[in-house]
Amino acid sequence: MSVPAFIDISEEDQAAELRAYLKSKGAEISEENSEGGLHVDLAQIIEACDVCLKEDDKDVESVMNSVVSLLLILEPDKQEALIESLCEKLVKFREGERPSLRLQLLSNLFHGMDKNTPVRYTVYCSLIKVAASCGAIQYIPTELDQVRKWISDWNLTTEKKHTLLRLLYEALVDCKKSDAASKVMVELLGSYTEDNASQARVDAHRCIVRALKDPNAFLFDHLLTLKPVKFLEGELIHDLLTIFVSAKLASYVKFYQNNKDFIDSLGLLHEQNMAKMRLLTFMGMAVENKEISFDTMQQELQIGADDVEAFVIDAVRTKMVYCKIDQTQRKVVVSHSTHRTFGKQQWQQLYDTLNAWKQNLNKVKNSLLSLSDT
C-alpha cells in the first residue's frame, strides 16, 4: 500500500516544506534542512510535530502522511528509532484526545510498511494501546490467526511475542470482548515451555480468575493442560480451578468456608460462584442420568423446592443442558448435556457414535444399490 505524500517534490524539498509548516504553527524548529541527512531531518520533524496535531484532521493527516512517506524511504536500520518515536507521540498525545485521528495515522503507517518489516510490531502495539484507550478495539485487526501470522512474519523474540499477546489481551478485556480475550490469554499461556512457565505465574493466575468470573464461561478443563497453570499446582488458585473443572457444589462450599478471604481477594463474588457451580453440578448430573428427581436436585444443588423450575429454565438458556420438566412426576428429563471435561472416555464415546453412523450409512448405501439393481 502506498502512502500519499504531502507534496510531489524531492525528499529534501519535502522535508523543508514540513519544517516551514511546523515552524508556522509555532514549533521550535529551523526551516533549514540538517546537514546530517534525511533521517536527522525526520528526527527533528517528529520531535516538533505535536503542534500540528491540534489542526483539522485532514491537515494533520496530510502532514503525517508526508512524514510517513519519508520514513519509508529510509533504510530499515534508520527507520526503527524514528518510527518508535512517532508512535510514542501518537500514543501519548494530550492524554487521549482525538483517538480516531491517531488511530487513522497509525493505521496509515502500519499498512504503508512492508508486511514483513519487524518494526511493524511497534506500530501494531501502538494501535492496540490507542484503540484500548477509547474502546475502539473493533476497528483494528485482532483476529488470532492473523496475529499469529504477524508474529511469525516479524520473527519476534519470545519476550516481544508475550508482550504483544498480553497487551492485546488487556485491550480486549478493557473493551468487554471477553471471548476474544480468553482465546488470546490461552494462546499466551500456551506459548510458554516447561523452562519458562514459572515466569507466567501472574498471567496464569489472571487467566483463571478471568475465566471463573466470566458469566458465559462454563468449561475450564483446557486450562489445566497449560504449562503455566500446571506450575500453580498445590496453590489455592489451582485447587479452586480444579473444583470448577470437575467437582460438585458441595466441594466449592467447603472450599469457600475454609478460604473465604482468598475468594474475596480474587474479586470473585460468592453468590456468582454458587450460581455457576450449581449449573456445573447439574451438567455433571445430566451426563450421568437422563432423569433427575426434584428431591435429588434440591439436595445436590442446595436449592428450595420452589426454585427448581426457575433453575432449570436458566440452565437451558445457557445451552449447556437440554431438558424438560415433568411436574407430575417431579423430575427433569434430560435430552442432552455438555460434558464438563473431554478426556479419553469422551473421545471413545465420540468414536463409537461416529462408527455407528458410518455403519448405518453403509447399510443405507447397500440398500439403495440393491434397489437400483432391481
From Swiss-Prot:
Domain of life: Eukaryota
Modified residues (N6-acetyllysine): 254
In-chain residues carrying the UniProt-annotated modification N-acetylserine: 2
Intrachain disulfide bonds: none
UniProt domain PCI: residue ranges: 180-339
Cell compartment(s), UniProt: Cytoplasm
Region span, Interaction with HSV-1 and HSV-2: 344-374
Pfam families assigned to the protein according to its UniProt record, in alphabetical order: eIF3m_C_helix, PCI
GO terms (BP aspect): cytoplasmic translational initiation; formation of cytoplasmic translation initiation complex; translational initiation
Any one GO cellular component localisation term in the record: eukaryotic 48S preinitiation complex
Effect seen on changing residue 354 to P: Reduces HSV binding and entry
Effect of residue 80 to G: In a breast cancer sample; somatic mutation
HAMAP family, alphabetized: eIF3m (MF_03012)
Membership in a protein family: Belongs to the eIF-3 subunit M family.
Record's subunit section: Component of the eukaryotic translation initiation factor 3 (eIF-3) complex, which is composed of 13 subunits: EIF3A, EIF3B, EIF3C, EIF3D, EIF3E, EIF3F, EIF3G, EIF3H, EIF3I, EIF3J, EIF3K, EIF3L and EIF3M. The eIF-3 complex appears to include 3 stable modules: module A is composed of EIF3A, EIF3B, EIF3G and EIF3I; module B is composed of EIF3F, EIF3H, and EIF3M; and module C is composed of EIF3C, EIF3D, EIF3E, EIF3K and EIF3L. EIF3C of module C binds EIF3B of module A and EIF3H of module B, thereby linking the three modules. EIF3J is a labile subunit that binds to the eIF-3 complex via EIF3B.
Name assigned to this protein: Eukaryotic translation initiation factor 3 subunit M
Species for this entry: Homo sapiens
The gene coding this protein: EIF3M
